[in-house]
């Protein structure tokens, strides 16, 4: 039996199919080559354009607008746009991940530096702190995750396919300069080629046999079309830069943090029944002891993140799970709380739509943030943008609007609490009206009721005897009944021996009547 037990067949193990190394390497090379195709296209197209434009300017022409100055201007714009393009492509836009340790160590994905402290003015769709689950890092304001680059980008504007990278905090200045220089270069090429075609081709046919007229016509067509489209795109980005906006912030709705959500939660649990009234004495021993305890908690809040306070980058959850809430609260209370939360979210959405842009500091300060403090570096595509991408200064209009919304919401909440307090007091007065007295003047709903002064229940003037049914015939023992017996003595005289039986029968009749 032992032999049979030891000889039980085991399940066959199939060999794992591993992808071939050469196939993965080939796929990686193909993706890298495809990502460099936009770069090769831009470099080749601009090189051909400057060659045709310079050739037209260097040839003798009857127009005073075409000559050596036009060729020099075209070459300068060509160099400026290509330098800006190269800088925008190969400059890291910035990421909240920072420098991570490489290698195949199991802990290589952990950060080696502490993330900087920052104040966030934007939240996610649920109202919590913004956290990237793919990068496993908190997202500061204006940072977004790019699915193409597979990482979060600081002050992300958009992912440009012609740059094969994201446009963010560090390379947005070079990208904007590239748009400006390219638009000017396209209009210069269009102007030079159009003037040359008008003055040379239509009036003289000596250039019709060469290849130059074909290139000039193509240059004028491409320069006009690309210049028209790119100029509008450039003007739009300049307007975004002056307003302190990004493409994502302009096209998508930004959800800002509610200015009074924590205050509403505090007032909801502390002052719903009048415990936080203005006339309460705050100098009592209990109040001072509670303040000392709150100070100790605040001092040790950062000691154990995630326990004494919500950890940064994580959404704070309720203290009780839905199952625990269902056990401790009734369905009506839970439904009432859900309705209240939905109404609060609706009000937050309305307030969020009325809020101005939080980071619009004025067109001067916005451009200084983008191009830097040194005027000599404004036209050079060097990364002179100020800020680290984590801390953003809010605008004065945003803070004023936030304070105004906070005051309005707190006023409405105070009116609701006062209405609930008045309704509660009215119900208590109605419930104690049968006692013949009212509630004490200084009594509040949070104080216990005193039953020492309860009075006895007043008489109503109605007894159970009054409500009991009465027989139309007199009962035994009543005066009317005795008079009837005296009158009927002559009738009962012959049957005196049976009187006891008759009396018992009469009592039985009365018992049956009752």
From Swiss-Prot:
Catalytic activity, EC: 2.3.1.225
Comp. bias (Polar residues): 318-328
InterPro entries the record matches: Palmitoyltrfase_DHHC (IPR001594), PFA4/ZDH16/20/ERF2-like (IPR039859)
UniProt GO BP: protein targeting to membrane
Chain spans, region Disordered: 307-336, 436-514
Membrane topology, from the record: Multi-pass membrane protein
Domain of life from the UniProt record: Eukaryota
Catalytic activity: L-cysteinyl-[protein] + hexadecanoyl-CoA = S-hexadecanoyl-L-cysteinyl-[protein] + CoA
GO cellular component terms, A-Z: endoplasmic reticulum; Golgi apparatus; vacuolar membrane
Description of post-translational modifications: Autopalmitoylated.
Disulfide cross-links: none
Domain DHHC: 130-180
Cytoplasmic side, ranges: 1-31, 86-174, 231-514
Residue ranges with Basic and acidic residues bias: 505-514
Record key words, sorted: Acyltransferase, Lipoprotein, Membrane, Palmitate, Transferase, Transmembrane, Transmembrane helix, Vacuole
Topology, Lumenal side: 53-64, 196-209
Main location: membrane
Compartments where located: Vacuole membrane
Residue stretches spanning the membrane: 32-52, 65-85, 175-195, 210-230
Molecular function per GO: protein-cysteine S-palmitoyltransferase activity
Function according to Swiss-Prot or TrEMBL: Palmitoyltransferase specific for VAC8. Palmitoylates VAC8 at one or more of its N-terminal cysteine residues, which is required for its proper membrane localization.
Comment block on domains: The DHHC domain is required for palmitoyltransferase activity.
Family, similarity comment: Belongs to the DHHC palmitoyltransferase family. PFA3 subfamily.
Protein's name in the database: Palmitoyltransferase pfa3
Organism field: Emericella nidulans (strain FGSC A4 / ATCC 38163 / CBS 112.46 / NRRL 194 / M139)
